[in-house]
A protein has these predicted regions:
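Short, charged phosphate-coordinating catalytic segments
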Residues: 155-178, 297
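Short, basic (Lys/Arg/His-rich) helix/loop patches that form interaction surfaces
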Residues: 249-297
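Flexible interdomain linker/hinge and immediately adjacent N-terminus
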Residues: 104-137
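Non-catalytic DNA-binding core/recognition domains of DNA-processing enzymes
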Residues: 16-107, 199
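Conserved hydrophobic/aromatic "anchor" residues
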Residues: 13, 33-34, 99, 210-213, ...
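Basic, Lys/Arg- and aromatic-enriched nucleic-acid-binding interface segment
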Residues: 131-162
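Basic, alpha-helical nucleic-acid-contacting "clamp/cap" segments
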Residues: 176, 185-266
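N-terminal DNA-binding module of tyrosine recombinases/phage integrases
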Residues: 1-17
Length: 297
C-alpha cells in the first residue's frame, strides 16, 4: 500500500473501474510510475494528498516527461534506464486520460499522436484460416496443435480477447460443445457482459479433439475446470529464499501470457498459419469482430 493518500485513492479508483486484464496492467504501470514520481518529490506537494490534484495537468506534465525519459522504470534494462518506446508513451497518455475521465475531468491528450492499429486480416483470410483448421482436424495432430486449433476455432466464433479466452472453463461450453459462454470485459472499463454464442461445426469438432487431450493432462494434475491447460511441466516463476521455484505439472491452467505465447509459437510452427495469422492475436480478434458486425447488418 502506498504511503501517499492520492495513490491509495487511485488504487480504489482502479478497483472500481473494472478494466479488462490488458488495460488493467497498463493502468497499474501508470500507478507505479506516479507513486515513484511522488517518492522522488518530482510532483507538486498537493498531488500527494489529492487524487484530483495528482491528475491535474500541473502534476501530469512533469510526470509524463519524467516517465518518457525512462527515469520511472521499475527495473533496469541492460543495466540502464532507457527512454520508453513511443508505443508505451501513447499507452501512458491514454491511461492518463482514462483516469481523468473516470473522475469527470476532460482528457488532456498530452503530446504525441495516435499509434495506428496494425492491419487486421480480411474476411477472405478468415475463411481460408477456417479451411486450414478443418484440414488439421482431418489428420493426426500433436497436443499443442490440437489446443491451438481449438483456440483459433473458438476465436473465429467469439472474437474474444486473450484475457476473455484464457478464463474460459469447461462449464462455459454448452451441450455437445454447441455453444460457448464468454464474458466481455471492455478494455477501457465498464460493465461486464456475458453471452452464449453458437459454435460452428468446425469449433465443435476442434473442441471435441482438444477435450480428449485435455482429459488426460488434467487427471495428472489433479483436476481443474479451466478449458485451456498446459501441455508440459513448467514452473510458477516465483523464487523462494533458496532460489528455488515450484514445479507445476502438465495440465495446470494456462494463463493469458501462456495462451498468447502458444498463438505466437504456433503461427510459426504449423504449415499454412504464418500466411493466414497476423503477428498478434488481438489483430485476429479485431478482424473477426469486424466480420461479425458486417454479417449482423
Amino acid at each position: 500500500m502506498s504511503k501517499f493518500p492520492s495513490v491509495r485513492a487511485l488504487d480504489q479508483l482502479l478497483d472500481d473501474l473494472g478494466a479488462g486484464a490488458a488495460r488493467r496492467r497498463q493502468l497499474d504501470m501508470v500507478r507505479g510510475e506516479l507513486n515513484r514520481a511522488l517518492e522522488r518529490d518530482a510532483l507538486p506537494v498537493g498531488a500527494r494528498r489529492s487524487l484530483r490534484r495528482l491528475l491535474e495537468e500541473e502534476a501530469l506534465g512533469p510526470y509524463v516527461r519524467l516517465a518518457e525519459s525512462g527515469t520511472l522504470r521499475h527495473r533496469r534494462v541492460e543495466g540502464g534506464l532507457p527512454p520508453t518506446s513511443e508505443a508505451t508513451n501513447e499507452i501512458r497518455r491514454r491511461c492518463v486520460d482514462l483516469l481523468r475521465e473516470a473522475l469527470g475531468m476532460p482528457a488532456l491528450r498530452l503530446g504525441g499522436g495516435e499509434i495506428p492499429l496494425q492491419p487486421a486480416p480480411e474476411a477472405g483470410t478468415l475463411s481460408a484460416l477456417a479451411r486450414q483448421l478443418d484440414q488439421y482436424l482431418a489428420g493426426a495432430m500433436s497436443p499443442a496443435q490440437t489446443r491451438l486449433t481449438a483456440l483459433l476455432a473458438v476465436e473465429l466464433d467469439t472474437a474474444g480477447r486473450s484475457g476473455e479466452l484464457a478464463v474460459l472453463r469447461t462449464n462455459d461450453l454448452g451441450k455437445d460443445n454447441a455453444a460457448v459462454y464468454i464474458e466481455r470485459h471492455p478494455q477501457g472499463g465498464g460493465a461486464v457482459e456475458g453471452e452464449w454464442i453458437e459454435t460452428s461445426a468446425l469449433t465443435r469438432a476442434a473442441l471435441g479433439r482438444w477435450l480428449d487431450v485435455r482429459k488426460d493432462l488434467v487427471q495428472r494434475a489433479h483436476g481443474t475446470t479451466r478449458l485451456w491447460v498446459s501441455l508440459w511441466m513448467n514452473h510458477d516463476g516465483v523464487l523462494d529464499d533458496d532460489g528455488h521455484t515450484t514445479i507445476r505439472p502438465a495440465g495446470m491452467p494456462l494463463e493469458e501470457n501462456g495462451l498468447v505465447t502458444s498463438y505466437r509459437v504456433g503461427r510459426l510452427r504449423y504449415d499454412g498459419l504464418r500466411q493466414l495469422l497476423p503477428l498478434k492475436l488481438e489483430q485476429l480478434r479485431r478482424a473477426v469482430d469486424a466480420d461479425r458486425q458486417r454479417t449482423a447488418t
